[in-house]
A protein has these predicted regions:
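N-terminal presequence-like segments and the immediate start of the first folded domain
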Residues: 1-59, 63-76, 82-133
Length: 133
């Protein structure tokens, strides 16, 4: 059974094409995606800058989703951890180049650092998707 995913954006709340205020899911299985960094298949960082790392994260998310027969439309929630000092708007623009117009519910958290100190990791994204049952 294919899940029914409805993006909820009440008229009385702010609208933004980059995210939904809430996502209602009926049916399907839940896929929990652990924190993704902007790394290549060999584990090296895709680049030292925020935009390059962000683009790679969304490429990696697509690979994970495709591996279970899903796509961007199945992603319902993202938590985005950004190292303080990064330009969030530049990161969101970089993500959209890879991801397109699929607005999951999101939370953004600015942090002092991420789980790989000294490596130069500037962003991490974990996510939840709903896939066919």
């Amino acid at each position: 059974m294919s899940p029914k995913i409805t993006h909820v954006n009440p008229e009385t709340l702010h609208k933004n094409p980059a995210f939904s205020q809430a996502v209602l899911v009926e049916g399907g299985k839940t896929l929990y995606i652990g924190g993704q960094n902007g790394v290549l298949a060999d584990g090296s960082l895709a680049g030292p800058d925020f935009a390059t790392q962000t683009e790679q994260i969304y490429r990696n998310l697509l690979k994970i989703l495709h591996s279970v027969g899903a796509s961007q439309k199945n992603l319902v929630k993202q938590t985005i951890f950004v190292v303080k000092g990064q330009n969030l708007q530049a990161g969101l623009a970089a993500a959209q180049k890879v991801w397109g117009p699929f607005p999951a519910a999101i939370s953004v958290v600015f942090v002092e650092g991420l789980g790989q100190p000294g490596r130069g990791v500037l962003i991490e994204v974990d996510a939840i998707a709903v896939v066919d049952a």
